[in-house]
Every structure is written in structure tokens, then in C-alpha cells.
């Protein structure tokens, strides 16, 4: 039987997650999306948003709308390839959402509002069994990154988990390979050159807490903060306290790139590191970590569903004589599409482990 899923927050990531599971052929087979929750419940508007996307193009599946009952004024149900998805009005308290009534088992929390564990636990009181937060979380929620530490999921302990950020999902697989293959990371600085997002301004506006963040996104390179590098220490404990970083928000609508400058724990060469990352991309990290030695630019990675695509051409070794520990690694990621696929993968992984635990 398909697992029953609800998506709280049908904005950019909520829609991308839904489209990702459709793309993977999971809708109605492994996953039954019972409901999507947002402030607006106009199914016709949701259908429009799904059909047409400036970055990712037209949705490949048929989307229509209908009414859940004759008494409602407007269509409040999406119909995608014959599968009905109810549009539910958002609530200030997740506990007030009708997950129990709808039979929802797993909630994908993508509003950006309930990222604290205690707040996200409201979904459990509303009747859901598990919650996946599609953002970094606070308050003790377990952070899981597919391909890195997803195996740490414990059905009896972890009821609210975080899928980390898109940037952590790009950086962590690279660091995971460096550690696993014995290169180690003594210390490192990460910069993400990150596409603008919906939280930014189209023209200069008010941003009291982040003055630079209030400047027009499409015409500026904007320095910003990120906790993505530090978060790697949460999923790879041996790197705890060794990584930090920053972000530059740039005038592109999608695809970002991580620049990791680090000191290895032993002498090595860029050729050895390159070979290890290439090997990992074809074996134990396949589908998570990619490898390219082509002359590619950001647009070439739109709709790439991998978490991190290592760029062999852009990687550097310090040219000082006898310096064999100082390197720069560059890796690309579609911060929308790749990340959304990992949310789907995490839900599937949890469901599989949960089923096994119940046997």
C-alpha cells in the first residue's frame, strides 16, 4: 500500500517535492499525497503554478481540478493523473490540521515556519506519525542527509527529522568521501555562490536584521550568512568545529555552487582526490554525488536531481612547493530540484525502516 503523505506549505519547495515524486513515478504507487496545505486553497491556482514554471518548464503530467463536495464555492481538489489531492487551509498551529482524519502518516513541513522541533511536533498531535522538515531545524530534531548519515534513522526515536539545507546536501557528500577515503579534513572554509530565492527582494526594500539582504536580488551580488558548513559536523561528527562558511546570493534564479577550500589531514594530490570522488560517484554515492569533467556552467545543471555534482575542471591544488594538503573543491547543485528529490528519498527511506520495525 502507498504511504499517505501531506505537504504543509505548497510554495516553491512544496511544489518541487510534489513534482519530484511525480517525476520518479511514485505518485499512487509508493506515495499517496492526500493533501497540500497553504493559506490559499484555490486548486485552480495551484494547478496553474504546477503547469508552468519559469525555471523548470512545463509540468509533464495532466493537472485538473474539482470540488471535494458540492457545498464548496471553488474547486479545492487537485487531480493529477487521476489522483485526488485535497487543498487544505493553513493553520497557525499544526496540531489543528486534520492529518488524523485524512489518514496522513508522513508530513513534509515546507512552510519555513515550523523548523523548531517543538513546533513541528504539532503535526504529530494533529494525527501524523512522522514529520520531515525541508530546512535546517532547531531544538534537537535529528538531521539526516541522504548518502551520508541516513542510516542513522531510528523509527522508535526519530519522529521529527530535518533534511538539512540544499547547501549542506551538496557539501556533506563531498566531505563524506574525503573522510571515508582517508584524506580527512583538518580545517576548511566553504563559500556557496547561491541563486536568489523567494525570501529576497525584487527591488531595494526594508530588511532591518540584514541590511544587505534587503537589496535588489536580480542586480546584485549579496554577501550573506549560512550555517551549511557547520551543519556538516552534525552529520559527520569527525568534522565538528572544523568547517565554517558564508554565502554570496547572485542574480540567477536556480542552481548554486559550493567552493570548499580545505586542509587535508594527510599529504595527497588533487589527482588522488579527483579519482576518489569519481569512483564514489559511480559506486557508493551514485545518484547523490555526480562527477563532471566537461566545461559546464550553471544553466547546465538545471533539473539535475543529484545532491552534488563535483567539477573536476574547477578543482585546484595549492602551487607552493611541497604543499600537499591545501586544496579547493568545487561542486554544483540545483538547489531546488536536487534538494526536493532528497526530501522524497528521505520519506521513502523512513517509510521502509518504519515498515521493517513494525514486522
From Swiss-Prot:
It catalyses: D-glyceraldehyde 3-phosphate + phosphate + NAD(+) = (2R)-3-phospho-glyceroyl phosphate + NADH + H(+). It comes from the Eukaryota. One of its GO terms (molecular function) is glyceraldehyde-3-phosphate dehydrogenase (NAD+) (phosphorylating) activity. Its main location: other. CDD domains: GAPDH_I_C, GAPDH_I_N. It is an enzyme of class 1 (oxidoreductase). One of its GO terms (biological process) is glucose metabolic process. D-glyceraldehyde 3-phosphate binds at residues 165-167, 197, 226-227, 249. One of its GO terms (cellular component) is glycosome. NAD(+) binds at residues 12-13, 38, 91, 134, 335. The record marks 194 as: Activates thiol group during catalysis. It is found in: Glycosome. The active site is at residue 166. Its EC number is 1.2.1.12. The keyword Nucleotide-binding does not apply. Keywords: Glycolysis, Glycosome, NAD, Oxidoreductase, Peroxisome. Pathway: Carbohydrate degradation; glycolysis; pyruvate from D-glyceraldehyde 3-phosphate: step 1/5. It holds the Pfam family Gp_dh_N. There are two identical genes that code for glycosomal GAPDH. Homotetramer. Belongs to the glyceraldehyde-3-phosphate dehydrogenase family. This is Glyceraldehyde-3-phosphate dehydrogenase, glycosomal.
